[in-house]
Amino acid sequence: LSGMGASAPAGRPAAPAAGTAPRSGGDRGVFEHVDDAVQAAWEAQRDWAAHYRLEDRQRIVEAIRRCARSHVEEWSRKIVEETGMGRYEDKVEKHLATINKTPGPECLTTDAISGDTGLMLEEYAPFGVICSITPTTNPTETIINNTISMISGGNSVVFNVHPRAKMVSAECLQALNTAIVEAGGPENLITMTREPTMENVDRMAANPKVRLMSGTGGTGMVNTLLRSGKKCIGAGAGNPPVIVDETADIQLAGQKIYEGASFDNNILCFAEKEVFAVGSACAGLIHQLEKQGACLLSTAQTEQMVKLVLQPNPKGGWEANKKWVGQNASKILAAIGVQVPDSCRLAVCQVPADHPFVLAEQMMPVLPVVCSASFEEAVDQAVAAEHGNRHTASIFSKDVDHMTRFARAVETTIYVKNSATKAGVGIGGEGHCTMTIAGPTGEGITCARSFCRRRRCVLAEGGLRIV
């Protein structure tokens, strides 16, 4: 379907020599105007879908993986430098998971049904040109992940990257484009504008050559995409709760919660944001978090922290002060007069369930712990804190009934039992990896299939049935 099985034309021209001027004024996929970026991607996609076989896609995806692996340390360092957020060593781990565990064309399996009346095939066909909006929290990781997934499905991509990460994003995109061309693929299979803006997104939404809108970011961005009138895949905000009940392995819970909540300074939408510990588990969990290296705040220090890192929002609630998002715990603690070594990756505070730290998605290594009177109360509190995002939640328990009851109550896209929530996207857990978790639009843990159309071909009158 759509050229997925077509042979590459004989005598196809070799990749252009280094220094050859790209078409439409672009520089290895980076354009000054969004319309040029879309036009170049549209031309590339027509070539890609018509003239490249699945084995060609697989070969080029492997070239992308090799290219990205060679830049992991460089891009991880540059993200920290440009965005001012997160931890270098954790970004290296994120990159490697994205590179190694994002599925390619191999997941585009064909469904076939044969019966008395004939044969039916359903296959995955490309949408065409996809607009992909990427976040500042995972800039190059999302470009790598989306590039592999989207071009594996036969699409091309026009990225609108986050302005705070535009330099490293452009470097990443240009390197991947070079790898694609050197492996025999078309120029400009992935493009972007040098200066990303929301106006560019509006222009792409209005451009008939863009057939699918995809975005990884906050709720406002997803709502903007949904108003575009086009097919949308949206990955929105989360505020993932964790429940630790009295049957849990408390040592394991302390280790994994510390690991997950401090990972990349908690800027990931799927990272643990608040904990509800039941009864006697509460004191033990806080003790285990301290043993891992967390700094436990006093009540007075907690209130100082609220004033420092949160601010009122227009809806009467609280939101993170962007100055402190993704900063090291030691830096945040120093600002309220608490001196800890740089090895301290997490601050912990014991608070009531209606505390601002519980209800606001703070995206920094400050973890509130609520002591719940019962498992039922913990579930109610956790569901309220999750705000109906249906994003991510986790539980530490040996009680299967508790695991099941919380899963049914919270209804999240990702649900992790007895591990850090990053295991839910393949970072330290089974299953494939993605940086686009499409909870609001229902695609879930996206892969190449998510960015394809289902097409059906039927041969009737009993044709091809051999039994």
Language-model segments: residues:
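N-terminal Rossmann-like NAD(P)+-binding subdomain of aldehyde/semialdehyde dehydrogenases
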Residues: 1-121, 149, 291
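ALDH superfamily catalytic-core signature
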Residues: 28, 222-353
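Structural signal for hydrophobic packing residues in well-ordered secondary-structure cores
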Residues: 5, 38, 42-49, 64-72, ...
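Short, surface-exposed amphipathic charged segments that create phosphate/polyanion-binding patches used
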Residues: 205-208, 249, 310-320, 361, ...
